[in-house]
């Protein structure tokens, strides 16, 4: 069967459509995970400390990890993530932008640090009284963060949040506790 002399022209038009579908799939919510309703981005704004996480290459080895969220006039959320790399003896920082997937009252966003690649950011547990802690999922159960307004979270609260994630089939046995002590270089010199 002949594809005709112009068949190769179809591929360039198909690639953007395929890329759009693949990139959109990176922002979805894992099945069974329900983002918080009644979300107030103004109260969520500010500094959050990473208490526990499922480790990934982009954070591997980092201590003292924080996220800073800032509401922008255009309706997006500015994101600054930073952490200390003991091996390099330096702070690492990345800036990005997040947009609500749908209704801003639902804690489900898509975030980018490297356009055009977006990832899901879904707050599925939140201290809605005081916004003191949050549990966040990425687009799959391979991404999980427990965040708090202070560098430490009471053990009973932390255990309850881990149990909530366990009930939703996150691999909580792989969670690591993030060190928020004074930054120490592997050579032994703190900065």
Label every PLM stretch briefly.
Residues 13-24:
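Bacterial N-terminal signal peptides
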Residues 2-6, 26-191:
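A beta-rich soluble binding module of mature secreted/lumenal proteins
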Residues 3, 10-13:
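Basic polycationic patches enriched in arginine
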């Amino acid at each position: 069967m002949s594809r005709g002399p112009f068949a190769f022209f179809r591929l360039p038009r198909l690639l953007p459509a395929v890329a759009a579908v693949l990139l959109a799939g990176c922002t979805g919510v894992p099945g069974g995970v329900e983002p918080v309703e009644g979300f107030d981005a103004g109260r969520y704004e500010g500094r959050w400390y990473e208490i526990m996480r499922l480790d990934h290459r982009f954070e591997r080895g980092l201590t003292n990890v924080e996220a800073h969220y800032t509401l922008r006039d255009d309706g997006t959320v500015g994101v600054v993530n930073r952490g200390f790399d003991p091996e390099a003896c330096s702070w690492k920082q990345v800036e990005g932008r997040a947009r609500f997937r749908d209704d801003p009252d639902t804690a489900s966003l898509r975030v980018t640090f490297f356009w055009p690649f977006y990832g899901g950011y879904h707050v599925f547990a939140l201290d809605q009284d005081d916004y003191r802690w949050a549990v966040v999922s990425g687009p799959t159960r391979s991404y999980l963060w427990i965040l708090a307004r202070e560098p430490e979270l009471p053990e009973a609260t932390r255990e309850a949040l881990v149990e909530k994630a366990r009930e939703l089939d996150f691999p909580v046995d792989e969670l690591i506790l993030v060190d928020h002590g004074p930054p120490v270089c592997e050579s032994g010199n703190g900065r």
